[in-house]
């Protein structure tokens, strides 16, 4: 069963993978991610997670799932950008 807790953990794992690219790309990786999140209207939702290590109670599973899908796209974009 998919729960907000399991989705929250997945967001953390994906962010860890994205953050790992800063070893290669420096701060430009985080700027790339922030810009993409902003363009898709998910920056505030992601910051909610970063600031609290969880999402607010009123955050829906759909919103978190959309964020996860976007983080996968960002990760794919970074892999392509850095040929990894």
Predicted regions and their residues:
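Acidic, low-complexity, intrinsically disordered interaction modules
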Residues: 19-84
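Short terminal alpha-helical segments
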Residues: 1-28
């Amino acid at each position: 069963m998919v729960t907000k807790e399991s989705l929250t953990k997945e967001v953390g794992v994906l962010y860890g993978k994205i953050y790992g690219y800063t070893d290669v790309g420096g701060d430009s990786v985080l700027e790339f991610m922030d810009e993409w999140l902003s363009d898709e209207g998910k920056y505030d939702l992601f910051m909610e997670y970063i600031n609290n290590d969880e999402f607010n109670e009123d955050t829906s599973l759909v919103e978190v799932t959309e964020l996860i899908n976007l983080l996968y796209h960002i990760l794919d974009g970074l892999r392509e950008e850095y040929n990894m």
